[in-house]
Amino acid sequence: MILTTEIINELIGIKESYQASDALMKILFDKGKREKMFRAFLEIDWHLDRDWFHAYFEEEHANKKKYAQDFTPDSISKLLSVIVGPSSKNLDVAAGTGSLMIQKWNHDRMSMSPLEYKPSMFFYQCEELSDRALPFLLFNY
């Protein structure tokens, strides 16, 4: 099943997409609700190697005119992670919903044997100034 705008709004518990950022931020601060919602997302889409909110945020929340918010296509994110290669420290200063860092994380973990890979070997830091994007970024991480 594909995560559509309607499904995401239902999982977050809202009727209109403009309510998503505030509602999601409240859920993130409640451990039980956060974990329950994450499991609900996983039941629909268990692929952790992509940004669940990429299309949703771009369609419903991006402010291209005022803040020049635009999203990196998955193909470019994958290419950049290959060009950069495995590295123990990673920084995205305009992370949006996290699609670049998700691809970097996926590339790093897939570049090693499952017997050698430890999440503690890598540090990922994301920065985002948009109050609307921040809850989606936090949920993705």
PLM ranges: what are they?
Residues 39, 59, 63-64, 88, ...:
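A near-ubiquitous, low-amplitude feature marking generic local secondary-structure context
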Residues 74-141:
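Conserved S-adenosyl-L-methionine
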Residues 44, 64-69, 125, 129:
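Conserved aromatic-histidine-acidic binding/catalytic patches
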Residues 1-59:
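A short N-terminal interaction module
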Residues 48-82:
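Class I SAM-dependent transferase core
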Residues 22, 30, 45, 49-51, ...:
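Acidic-enriched, low-complexity/disordered segments with a strong bias for Aspartate over Glutamate
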